[in-house]
């Protein structure tokens, strides 16, 4: 019988190891071809992560300098393209702040209702996509069923499923269509039970819990220092939501809770989004019940298109108004402004400098995904390589918003 001996090295000689650089993306299922992470590995541990961005850069901020304020709305659709009504709203509020105007109350209710539908749509996707990135595909198939219902509602209102471009400075493009309220009430009746389905699928799933609980922890102090916002901030125990703390539109008339958790890990960030969908449903139901009659757009010929489109065909004044706004846009007083909303990913803000012309002199977008992505620096120290996908997925960045 052959004697088994232990392999050994001379006493005092260290094991020869070296750090490895690994490219995660851009050709990787979790980064969708638009994000490259250069990982510095010590064995299976991630010592450092260096995000390389810009694969989806389209020059949104520079393009805005050549567009009228109305023409910029389609550009905002393509920031967080999962939730375009929120992007439209943030930009519209910034311009209205410069003009010193407010949209009619009915328009504000419509805007808020659409923004909350967009929030649910965005949260639904990450509710199913995070488990899918970790190997559990079933949840994604469930959430896409409800997300399709939201797409149908948005298409019913705007005529488009994704790039809605529905907001306008001073209101919205048109009023809600006939038959909309029965459709959205049907969704409101169905959706709470569907959320419970997602929870039953995942909240007791040991594999999902082991891959997310205690992984990628961000403390409250680090979250504030990094400038995180949205669910990524609230999952670390920081109770901050612009809708409640700096209310805009009609949020101060609505009753809803701000969801927070203390763990700060991947599971807490996932759980915050699931619970926020319930609060968004409460907001939508209140908007339906409180929806007032009235105009959907401000009645200012120098800013808004004619409320009655038929007047364009029989009134010279209305035709001139329509032509001027379409061809040349409206002038905004000189000044600068910053306005932010609580978008699904966090604080989405627009900083605009006006020189008094129909086009902005400078526009800066404060994109929450851009800020949230830097949290990768703080949560990956001494974590396994296999955890990187869970950490990235739980931060829920949209690269179109990062690269602009």
From Swiss-Prot:
GO MF terms held by the record: NAD binding; NADH:ubiquinone reductase (non-electrogenic) activity; quinone binding
Record SUPFAM superfamilies: HydB/Nqo4-like
EC number: 7.1.1.-
Recorded topology in the membrane: Peripheral membrane protein
Keywords noted in UniProt: Cell inner membrane, Cell membrane, Membrane, NAD, Quinone, Translocase, Transport, Ubiquinone
Pfam families membership: Complex1_49kDa
Gene3D superfamilies for this protein: Cytochrome-c3 Hydrogenase, chain B
The keyword Protease appears for this protein: no
NCBIfam families listed in its UniProt record: NuoD, PRK06075.1
Family in the record: Belongs to the complex I 49 kDa subunit family.
Function: NDH-1 shuttles electrons from NADH, via FMN and iron-sulfur (Fe-S) centers, to quinones in the respiratory chain. The immediate electron acceptor for the enzyme in this species is believed to be ubiquinone. Couples the redox reaction to proton translocation (for every two electrons transferred, four hydrogen ions are translocated across the cytoplasmic membrane), and thus conserves the redox energy in a proton gradient.
Quaternary structure annotation from Swiss-Prot or TrEMBL: NDH-1 is composed of 14 different subunits. Subunits NuoB, C, D, E, F, and G constitute the peripheral sector of the complex.
Official protein name in the record: NADH-quinone oxidoreductase subunit D 2
Organism of derivation: Rhizobium etli (strain ATCC 51251 / DSM 11541 / JCM 21823 / NBRC 15573 / CFN 42)
